Regions:
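Catalytic cores and adjacent binding grooves of peptidoglycan-active enzymes
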Residues: 121-180
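Cleaved targeting-peptide boundary
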Residues: 28-36
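Secretory targeting and sorting signals
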Residues: 1-27
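Surface-exposed flexible segments
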Residues: 35-39, 48, 123-126
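Active-site acidic/histidine clusters and adjacent loop/turn architecture
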Residues: 41-109
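Acidic helix-start/capping segments at beta-turn-to-alpha-helix junctions
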Residues: 110-121
Length: 180
């Protein structure tokens, strides 16, 4: 069933991308991501064009859901590793964090987006699939209490998105919007 849901989600994203004429051009950053270079087993993947957002569009969506963001450099330049940028983030990634906010009721602060400086890979920050968030007791309890532990410090949601607790933040990979 999850495979069918994922396939339908991917197909819907492809149709949306075609309808609004978004670009599928994706760049890569240096390095590799051995944990998240491939989706979990059973995740349907189809070569499609993801719907990309500008930084302004993404922040408007985050703001409307009560989600905050911050950066160590106080900036949003995608080419500066001390900034937090949402330029070229996938629409489904923003919808995924909005779904997490709504479902958990937790305050969420995003600390990493599509800016340079993260590991590369198909499902990377640079390519718009990943966000980092601050740790909080509320968010920790929600993720660890509602999602399936898949080893180490990783949890998988029912929708197949991956939540990886990396020391001082959550590194979240959104393959889809998580039931938006």
């Amino acid at each position: 069933m999850r495979l069918v849901v994922r396939a339908l989600t991917v197909a819907a994203a492809a149709a949306t991308a075609l309808l609004i004429g978004t670009s599928g051009a994706q760049a890569t950053a240096n390095g590799s991501d051995p944990v998240f270079d491939n989706p979990p087993a059973g995740t349907a993947t189809i070569g499609i064009l993801a719907t990309k957002l500008t930084h302004a569009d993404a922040t408007a969506r985050l703001r409307s859901s009560g989600i905050t963001w911050s950066s160590s450099g106080g900036c949003s330049n995608r080419n500066n590793a001390t900034c937090t940028s949402f330029d070229q983030v996938n629409l489904t990634t923003i919808q995924g964090i909005q779904t997490l906010r709504s479902a958990s009721g937790c305050a969420i602060n995003v600390t990493g987006g599509t800016e340079t400086g993260h590991a590369s890979g198909t499902y990377s920050h640079w390519n718009g699939y990943k966000l980092d968030t601050s740790l909080s007791t509320c968010l920790n309890n929600y993720i660890q209490g509602n999602f399936s532990s898949i080893g180490g410090s990783k949890w998988e949601s029912g929708a197949g998105n991956i939540y990886y607790k990396e020391g001082n933040h959550w590194d979240i990979t959104y393959y889809n919007c998580g039931g938006c």
